[in-house]
Amino acid sequence: MVCEKCEKKLGTVITPDTWKDGARNTTESGGRKLNENKALTSKKARFDPYGKNKFSTCRICKSSVHQPGSHYCQGCAYKKGICAMCGKKVLDTKNYKQTSV
């Protein structure tokens, strides 16, 4: 669960955009090369388990968080009804039985 403010902070997917005027993946603007595998060529998007940008641990259950910039794992964020990135209350879970199974 992510709040509206933190949705802007989420990363973009490696797949190209659908074609439209002004898209960032068109060849005319020089933004995207043809026959390029972005998963192999982009060094900053590649996962480095021992590097500086390691994933943090959840503040509640201490498990590893698989989203850069998040402080809570998705299971704990769902159970508590909070944003996974900032911890802001998103959903009132008073009358719910929240399970992550």
From Swiss-Prot:
GO terms for biological process: cytoplasmic microtubule organization; mRNA processing; protein localization to microtubule; regulation of postsynaptic density assembly; regulation of postsynaptic density protein 95 clustering; RNA splicing. It is found in: Cytoplasm; Synapse; Cell projection, Dendritic spine. Residues 95-101 are annotated as: Sufficient for interaction with DLG4. Signal peptide: none annotated. InterPro entries: PDZ-binding_CRIPT (IPR019367). The keyword Hydrolase does not apply. As a component of the minor spliceosome, involved in the splicing of U12-type introns in pre-mRNAs. Involved in the cytoskeletal anchoring of DLG4 in excitatory synapses. This is Cysteine-rich PDZ-binding protein. It comes from Homo sapiens.
